[in-house]
Amino acid sequence: METFLFTSESVNEGHPDKLCDQISDAVLDACLAQDPDSKVACETCTKTNMVMVFGEITTKADVDYEQIVRKTCREIGFISDDVGLDADHCKVLVNIEQQSPDIAQGVHGHFTKRPEEIGAGDQGHMFGYATDETLELMPKCHVLATKLGAKLTEVRKNGTCPWLRPHGKTQVTVEYRNDNGAMVPERVHTVLISTQHDETVPNDEIAPDLKEHVIKPVIPEKYLDENTIFHLNPSGRFVIGGPHGDAGLTGRKIIIDTYGGWGAHGGGAFSGKDPTKVDRSGAYIVRQAAKSIVANGLARRCIVQVSYAIGVPEPLSLFVDTYGTGSIPDKEILEIIKEHFDFRPGMISINLDLKRGGNGRSQKTAAYGHFGRDDPDFTWETVKPLKWEKAQA
């Protein structure tokens, strides 16, 4: 039996880039909660003792940017210099301007256009992907790496492993078999965890704790064997972390946010962007399309691409590939997608309820992935029932 190895990585919420994603999305949530028509393009960067929020925002909302920055940092666990950042004493810089009037007139006509007339906020191409190898219809190695990162945070916050600090990274290599285009995970080949830790914890305590409290609850026993390789804090020391150890920037973890290297990526980041930005809304609708194709039994594996021009509502192109796993030809699946999904940005916002802020909705997406999550706020994960003419037996 021929197999191959494929690897996906993840980082948890204390990684500096992910801290920035969460701040940008917390700002978006605050704007949308008060003004669902807010136009937000919010970037964040951070380094030792400093967080800066900058970008273009047009909103009727009254937003305290500094308060949002400090609250987000505090919730993640950055509460003192020795963990990488002190939420209450770090410098917070804000440089926010209004959306360019040139963009505003082209995209939403300064708020005069009907939803179906709203153009894409920029050009670009986005991909959605789904695979039947997990219940989430997501790649196995990506799901496991993401869940390990989430578990690291959980056992830090609940006190199970009090020596843990916020910044952590995970990586999982899975041995796969190709079943006529569908991916079948056979076993976990390698598990890698690098996590920031307290200065006082001995190295010989870190590995057993990570195996017992992080790896065992996440990776099913059937995927682990005597040949599985574990690299647990292989650098030997990871005390300096967070923004003190590395600079952070919004939008630098786009593969972690999506499919862990599977499928494809158009390059656009998600966090800090309102639904007129098709980098985000376009990627959400093609995920729903790909997931619905697989969940309805039309294919075992599927990728969908959509592309846009700035100011134009209708997509320029749609593409589907089922990697040879389709139960009907791909050209017929493409017609089914066109029939069941509306790819115009204004209609995506309505159909996926993307203008709704509050409940930390966008901020939830900014750590541990935008896809494969079981949460009613992740409306794009809802499978659409698809109707098509089945071939007569």
Curated annotation (Swiss-Prot):
- Cofactor stoichiometry and binding? Binds 2 divalent ions per subunit. The metal ions interact primarily with the substrate. Can utilize magnesium, manganese or cobalt (in vitro). Binds 1 potassium ion per subunit. The potassium ion interacts primarily with the substrate.
Tissues and organs where the protein is expressed, per its UniProt entry: Root.
Any one Pfam family here would be S-AdoMet_synt_N
Identify the residues that bind L-methionine.
E56, Q99, D246, K277
| GO BP annotations listed | one-carbon metabolic process; S-adenosylmethionine biosynthetic process
Positions bound to K(+): E43
Q: Give the enzyme's EC designation.
A: 2.5.1.6
Entry's Gene Ontology molecular function annotations = ATP binding; metal ion binding; methionine adenosyltransferase activity
Q: Which residues bind ATP?
A: H15, H167, G168, K169, S235, G236, R237, F238, D246, R252, K253, A269, K273, K277
Cellular component per GO?
A: cytoplasm
User: What positions does the entry give for Mg(2+) binding?
Assistant: E9
Task: Keywords in alphabetical order, please.
Answer: ATP-binding, Cobalt, Cytoplasm, Magnesium, Metal-binding, Nucleotide-binding, One-carbon metabolism, Potassium, Transferase
Q: In which pathway does it act?
A: Amino-acid biosynthesis; S-adenosyl-L-methionine biosynthesis; S-adenosyl-L-methionine from L-methionine: step 1/1
Keyword Nucleotide-binding part of the UniProt annotation: yes
Predominant location of this chain?
cytoplasm
Query: Reaction(s) catalyzed by this protein?
Result: L-methionine + ATP + H2O = S-adenosyl-L-methionine + phosphate + diphosphate
Its annotated compartments are: Cytoplasm
Task: Keyword check for Ribosomal protein, yes or no.
Answer: no
InterPro entries, per database record: ADOMET_SYNTHASE_CS, S-AdoMet_synt_C, S-AdoMet_synt_central, S-AdoMet_synt_N, S-AdoMet_synthetase, S-AdoMet_synthetase_sfam
Its signal peptide is: none
* Cofactor(s) of this protein: Mn(2+); Mg(2+); Co(2+); K(+)
Q: What does this protein do?
A: Catalyzes the formation of S-adenosylmethionine from methionine and ATP. The reaction comprises two steps that are both catalyzed by the same enzyme: formation of S-adenosylmethionine (AdoMet) and triphosphate, and subsequent hydrolysis of the triphosphate.
Query: Per its UniProt record, what HAMAP family does this chain match?
Result: S_AdoMet_synth1 (MF_00086)
Describe the protein's quaternary organization and the partners it interacts with.
Homotetramer.
The similarity annotation says: Belongs to the AdoMet synthase family.
What protein does this entry describe? S-adenosylmethionine synthase
- Origin species, per record, is Pinus banksiana
User: Source gene?
Assistant: METK
